[in-house]
Amino acid sequence: GVLAGRDGAAELLKDALALYDLRFWNEEEGLSCDTWNTEFTELDPYRGLNANMHTVEAFLAAADVTGDEKYRVRAGRIIDHVLVWAKDNNWRIPEHFSSDWVPDLECNKDRPDDQFKPYGATPGHGIEWARLITQWVLSTYKEDKAGAAPYIEAAENLYNRAVADAWNADGAPGICYTTDWNGKPVVHDRMHWTLAEAINTSAVLSNVTD
């Protein structure tokens, strides 16, 4: 809306970022919390990477639109956390955490197809993180290829792990929704957004790594 010159868009963005800074972003942790009640009096102890993934996406857009580089820096801080967790877990990204950011790898094991907090790894998110990391590193490091290289390699690791685990994993075409921590499919559904992200990320990584 801001780039399109829509009336009120700049003010709406300013208000949204101010609220996010106040209620959701934790500067000390370098991560975002997940859920408040509507009165902003009770913060849910659950912490999750789905919210932080979309926060990275929003921060990159905010940096581009406003010119305020603090949002790009914040996106990088989130990414650095995610890469530590992913590397420690064979590049399968933990999704669910306690309030002090300890991964809960057993979350919803008894309800693996929970709509908002499914059990296990979500390969589509690994693919999406790979694209976001690449987008961030290109806009941050620009011509500094040596500085960018470890992040590009990490993005490839996330992408390759997700595809190896989930592509045609159960004999059916497409990318399964979730796997366990050994890469075995759990929820076999095929989501439209997963394939869309895979096509997007494939194109991005191909352009960057060729």
Language model region names:
Residues G1-D210:
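Glycan-recognition and catalytic cores of secretory/periplasmic carbohydrate-active enzymes
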